[in-house]
């Protein structure tokens, strides 16, 4: 999965997919009442990027639905996965359940079209704080209460805080999550990747490949350089988040990688660990 980073303006959906992304990451900011408000990152953000592009969240969802609904004039067949980077650090821990509830209501209405031929992309809810695990509970229970528990088949999870992998597993146990887990690892592109290294990403890959691990997929962020892309592919990640999808696409076409990797399509299950 080539994951376009910080796609917060509607026009950027086309831009990133045209550059080679089959997945996008969208920042979601919340108001004081835990309601998703804007697709907005804010300052600071990655180097060589504008941090302040934004849309109203529900407007973005409607555009995203069009981009992922077969037959629509704005449809992109290859856009199959959307990561919502949920900026919940502005919220108190007790608001996490409410944030999940309101997020589910917004997605149900504006993205899934109340279960009637809505957008088809798989969705990953990425939470920065392990203490906010109840967001998952609120999201899941709301879909169930609204009569659409089946939509959870399209939803996966990520804790993005680079916490110890054992601690992440405990948070999932508290939330009752037993699958559909993506594990992110990484650092802003402003800091050279060799300073952080790939040790934690390697641990995540090892967990994914073990018989009793909780992780289904591993992605690494934010990768803009050819050398770092190769390093991430060499340890066996499933996804790379990038500001330059064309860089990742070019590396995937190199002889060392094109036999081993290919771009994921809608038919590839994002909740299943890939077995060679």
Swiss-Prot record:
Expressed by the venom gland. It is found in: Secreted. The keyword Secreted applies. Pfam families: GDPD_2. This is Dermonecrotic toxin LarSicTox-alphaIB2c. It comes from the Eukaryota. It catalyses: an N-(acyl)-sphingosylphosphocholine = an N-(acyl)-sphingosyl-1,3-cyclic phosphate + choline; an N-(acyl)-sphingosylphosphoethanolamine = an N-(acyl)-sphingosyl-1,3-cyclic phosphate + ethanolamine; a 1-acyl-sn-glycero-3-phosphocholine = a 1-acyl-sn-glycero-2,3-cyclic phosphate + choline; a 1-acyl-sn-glycero-3-phosphoethanolamine = a 1-acyl-sn-glycero-2,3-cyclic phosphate + ethanolamine. Dermonecrotic toxins cleave the phosphodiester linkage between the phosphate and headgroup of certain phospholipids (sphingolipid and lysolipid substrates), forming an alcohol (often choline) and a cyclic phosphate. This toxin acts on sphingomyelin (SM). It may also act on ceramide phosphoethanolamine (CPE), lysophosphatidylcholine (LPC) and lysophosphatidylethanolamine (LPE), but not on lysophosphatidylserine (LPS), and lysophosphatidylglycerol (LPG). It acts by transphosphatidylation, releasing exclusively cyclic phosphate products as second products. Mg(2+) binds at residues 25, 27, 85. Glycans are attached at residue 253. Disulfide bonds join 45-51, 47-190. Its EC number is 4.6.1.-. GO terms for cellular component: extracellular region. One of its GO terms (molecular function) is metal ion binding. Transmembrane segments: none annotated. Coiled coil: none annotated. It comes from Loxosceles arizonica (Arizona brown spider).
């Amino acid at each position: 999965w080539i994951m376009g980073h910080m796609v917060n303006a509607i026009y950027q959906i086309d831009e990133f997919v045209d550059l080679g992304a089959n997945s996008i990451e969208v920042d979601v900011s919340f108001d004081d009442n835990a309601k998703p408000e804007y697709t907005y990152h804010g300052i600071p953000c990655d180097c060589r990027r504008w941090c302040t592009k934004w849309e109203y969240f529900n407007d973005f969802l409607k555009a995203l639905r069009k981009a992922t609904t077969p037959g629509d004039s704005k449809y992109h067949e290859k856009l199959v996965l959307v990561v919502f980077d949920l900026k919940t650090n502005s919220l108190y821990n007790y608001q996490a359940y409410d944030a999940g509830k309101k997020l589910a209501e917004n997605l149900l209405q504006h993205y899934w079209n109340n279960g009637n031929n809505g957008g088809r992309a798989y969705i990953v809810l990425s939470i920065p704080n392990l203490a906010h695990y109840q967001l998952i509970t609120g999201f899941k229970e709301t879909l169930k209460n609204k009569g659409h528990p089946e939509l959870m088949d399209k939803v996966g999870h990520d804790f993005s805080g680079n916490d110890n992998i054992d601690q992440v597993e405990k948070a999932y146990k508290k939330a009752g999550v037993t699958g559909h887990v993506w594990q992110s690892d990484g650092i802003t592109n402003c800091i050279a990747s060799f300073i952080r290294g790939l040790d934690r990403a390697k641990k995540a890959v090892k967990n994914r490949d073990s018989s009793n691990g909780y992780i289904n997929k591993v992605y690494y962020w934010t990768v803009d350089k050819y050398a770092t892309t190769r390093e991430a592919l060499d340890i066996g990640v499933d996804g790379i988040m990038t500001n330059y999808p064309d860089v990742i696409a070019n590396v995937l076409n190199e002889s060392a990688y094109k036999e081993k990797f290919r771009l994921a399509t809608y038919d590839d299950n994002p909740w299943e660990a890939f077995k060679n």
